[in-house]
């Protein structure tokens, strides 16, 4: 899709670059698949900030997206491709042969009128969902499960994908965009193709207010704070005085924070190894 630059009619418009998507639905979402979404402002039930840089933003409705794709053997037709404010990828509204409608993450190239299917015998084409044991080696996949039947957890954001490298017994070996190689059970499901809206990283918001519309608050450097607020704060001139740490003193560079030792054995190649 083309990248459109705005005329500099104001300072806020000067640096705006947006992606034009002429194929997206211009109306409201399908009402039965929409839920209310309450904003937390990054606070927990005690009112304490648990996630920094979150707050404000435009009201949004949550679209109920089907990540399990468990309607096997029932073909579906894509009614339309829609914008979803809750994610970077676009979503597709499917109408199944039995009349049910569901949203899915739209893969690259999927358009209204296309047919998609789920199940062991689904043909190998973008948008179809089937187990990893039935995928051709070298396939580009997205919406990959980590646990059988739990629903997709990997490669769900705009332009992402994983590659199926091979199979070893009851496990498939995949390579993620980060460079990590890991084993996933062959009965876990995935969808053929890569996620839509791959130009998302080329856009430029142009002004701070565009981030505020999205519920993102400013990020202040620790060096610009006082010593009471951050370990990097204070000092004469620009001086950290210590190695980079978080506001709570945890090392910020090179320190591994992974605690799920149970699944570490599934990782063949770490994403940090270059």
From Swiss-Prot:
Q: Where in the sequence does UniProt note compositional bias of the Basic and acidic residues kind?
A: 229-239
What Pfam families does the annotation carry? Answer: Ribosomal_L2, Ribosomal_L2_C
- Ranges that cross the membrane: none
User: What molecular functions are annotated in GO for this chain?
Assistant: rRNA binding; structural constituent of ribosome; transferase activity
Gene3D superfamilies named among the record's database cross-references? 2.30.30.30, Nucleic acid-binding proteins, Ribosomal protein L2, domain 3
- Tell me its family: Belongs to the universal ribosomal protein uL2 family.
Q: NCBIfam families per the record?
A: rplB_bact
Instruction: Please give the name of this protein.
Output: Large ribosomal subunit protein uL2
- Origin species, per record, is Acinetobacter baylyi (strain ATCC 33305 / BD413 / ADP1)
Designated gene of the protein: rplB
